[in-house]
Design a protein with these regions (language model features):
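Histidine-rich, glycine-flanked metal-binding segment
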Residues: 32, 36-72, 93
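Metal-associated gating/positioning segment near the N- to mid-region
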Residues: 69-136, 197, 220-221, 225-228
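Acidic/histidine-rich helix-loop elements
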Residues: 82-101, 153-162, 185-193, 275-288
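His/Asp/Glu-enriched, well-ordered alpha-helical/loop segment
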Residues: 100, 208, 280, 291-377
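Divalent metal-dependent hydrolysis catalytic cores, especially in the metallo-beta-lactamase
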Residues: 103-129, 141-152, 174-187, 212, ...
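Active-site gating/metal-coordination segments in enzymes
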Residues: 149-204, 224
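Active-site core of metal-dependent hydrolases
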Residues: 189-293, 311, 316-318, 336, ...
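C-terminal cap of metal-dependent C-N hydrolases
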Residues: 346-348, 352, 365-407
């Protein structure tokens, strides 16, 4: 998305209603998930500036009393299309618009995602301006990792392996956090769409540059992405057991979706119908329903593979921003993943896949103070992830609804 930082700052000005953290903040918790699979009981998290500096049950005075809630690290969505939105006419407006109105929509998508408890997202759209504005404290939004331009098999990208390598270097120089490669088409298309030599050249050059490669791969392209040594396979429809085991053996991360994307198309069929790349009429969306058990089946099979690193990514498009947890719920309810494993996939494992586990993804000393609180216990009822009552990102509180929770105890501060 090509909009200036100024445009994004202007777009988000009305939404900047949050409180800067004081130098030292103490958060009291009765139950906290550390993001790595452990549960902390009856302790206090001490934040100084943007970092967690202590976990001390005797720290005082208490600034935020979150006892009675479930506290955990901010969630991470490893695959979003943050510029995708519905336009003024209510229809799908696609991705990457360069108008002021499109900038407002993108900023609103990001803000809704933050308030839903997601403190870091990985955008498959080019949103470098938004990324920088957020990083410099100008916008209330999740921390953003972004591509600059995807490798999709057009123009300069269809040349020799050397030309593909030059394209990858161009992305690195332009400030890409990672490289997105489209190696296959839609959900029903089985053929690999990029030459294997080009895919291998791209992944190899990116690896030399320290750039991660995320490959959109279904069916034949799953094997191609694995053979090329990519960092992460996205979607993975049609992945065989051999493919899944190969990913585990090679340490390749896997980012399947469990059904929210398909359900979103079905729920919003009237808004997507007749727009580019979608069926012309709402009635023509019904066959998509057949894909729900297929996507859920991929998650079910992947979860049974020892050592396979499954990260949480939703492929969030228009209609999904701010509702990203629905795919997390789907992974547990339909995919059979244990609640703790699902939550870790959206915390420390996602951070590890992004090479940011030394900064985010856990409640640990020295990490960013990305802290959320849920009204309920997601280990007993995964739908509790819908009830985000408190959001802190990098030591700054963006949401505080704990005063409205009937079972919560007294609280000494409010950002509202």
């Amino acid at each position: 998305m090509r909009v200036t930082t100024f445009l994004l700052l202007l777009a988000m000005a009305p939404l900047r209603q949050f409180a800067e953290a004081e130098n030292r903040v103490v958060i009291a918790v009765s139950t906290a998930l550390d993001g790595k699979g452990k549960v902390l009981r009856d302790t206090r998290i001490v934040v100084s500036g943007s970092k967690i500096v202590a976990i001390d049950p005797k720290a005082s005075p208490i600034d935020y009393d979150l006892r009675g809630l479930t506290v955990m690290p901010g969630l991470i969505d490893a695959h979003v299309h943050i510029t995708s939105s519905f336009g003024p006419d209510g229809k799908n407006a696609g991705m990457g618009g360069a108008t002021l109105e499109a900038a407002y929509r993108t900023a609103a998508n990001a803000y809704a995602t933050l308030l839903a408890g997601f403190t870091t997202i990985q955008s498959m759209d080019s949103v470098a301006a938004l990324r920088e504005a957020v990083a410099h404290g100008g916008l209330p939004a999740p921390r953003i990792l972004s591509i600059t331009e995807p490798l999709v098999g057009r123009g300069e990208q269809t040349g020799t392996p050397d030309e593909v390598r030059a394209f990858v270097r161009k992305q690195k120089d332009a400030g890409a956090d990672f490289l997105k490669i489209y190696a296959s088409g839609g959900m029903r298309q089985t053929a690999q769409t990029i030459p294997q030599t080009a895919l291998e050249a791209a992944c190899d050059e990116a690896r030399k540059l320290g750039l991660r490669t995320l490959v959109h791969a279904n069916y034949d392209a799953v094997h191609g992405a694995i053979a090329a040594g990519c960092t992460q396979v996205e979607h993975g429809l049609g992945a065989t057991e051999a493919d899944l085991r190969a990913m585990a053996e090679k340490g390749i991360y896997f980012d399947p979706q469990a059904g929210q994307l398909i359900q979103n198309y079905l729920d919003n069929r009237a808004r997507y119908a007749g727009t580019p790349y979608f069926p012309k009429t709402p009635q023509e969306f019904e066959p998509m329903r057949e894909l729900l058990p297929i996507t859920q089946g991929v998650v079910q099979r992947a979860h049974k593979i020892p050592g396979l690193k499954i990260v949480f990514g939703t492929d969030a498009l228009a209609g999904m921003h701010g509702h990203n947890v629905e795919d997390l719920i789907n992974r547990v309810v339909e995919g059979g993943i244990a609640p703790m494993d699902a939550l870790v996939s959206a915390n420390s494992l996602a951070a590890e896949a992004m090479k940011m586990d030394d900064q985010i993804g856990a409640l640990a000393l020295g990490l960013e103070a990305d802290i959320i609180a849920l009204d309920g216990d997601p280990l007993k009822d995964i739908t509790a992830v819908r009830g985000v009552a408190f959001v802190m990102k990098g030591g700054t509180v963006y949401k505080n609804e704990i005063h409205s929770m009937p079972h919560s105890r007294s609280h000494s501060k409010s950002v509202r």
